[in-house]
């Protein structure tokens, strides 16, 4: 493996279709990771919300082929995204053989299966905000897969095909969980306004989708 020596790699983060009907609810995980990457100086980072836009598979591949990302991040937040992720990774590998494919989300719990049965190269095993930034920083200088062993929160197959799972990074603080650059969606014309009653019960329900809110250190 030899990565391209870019000062700023081109990165595209994509979602996967979650349900039969598209949803305009903001994809918090993807947005949070993109925010952190941009803050770290990786300004050539872009978002393709497949779950909302619902392009055909052919349109998705055509878009990625045109954009030529150096790193493709797949946000797979549900286990049912496996079939789509597998199909997407193989198709991308065929048309963009030099693109590094990085996966995050709950599907990463099945890291060994994904790494051995798909064309995904690396998996974020926990929170992606720190891992994604550290991963891209290491990508800039790595010569082999083994060079990624110091990136926390990462899973991959080394040069000998052995599964490597690195330690988790320190969790982000409660203040950072929703520290998101909402202009990412606004610039794409994909932002929606969510209004709720001004009481704690409603607010807890509205933002109750992220299990990290239950962590003791974030209460």
Feature locations, PLM:
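Glycine- and acidic-residue-enriched helix-capping/strand-helix junction motifs
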Residues: 19-30
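Short hydrophobic segments within beta-strands
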Residues: 14-17, 48, 75, 104, ...
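N-terminal cofactor/phosphate-binding cores enriched in small/glycine residues
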Residues: 33
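Radical SAM [4Fe-4S] cluster-binding motif and immediate context
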Residues: 180-219
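Short boundary motifs at domain starts and secondary-structure transition points
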Residues: 1-6
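Glycine-rich beta-alpha loop elements in corrinoid/cobalamin-binding modules
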Residues: 36, 44-174
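Nucleotide-activated donor-dependent transferases that construct or modify glycoconjugates
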Residues: 9-21, 72
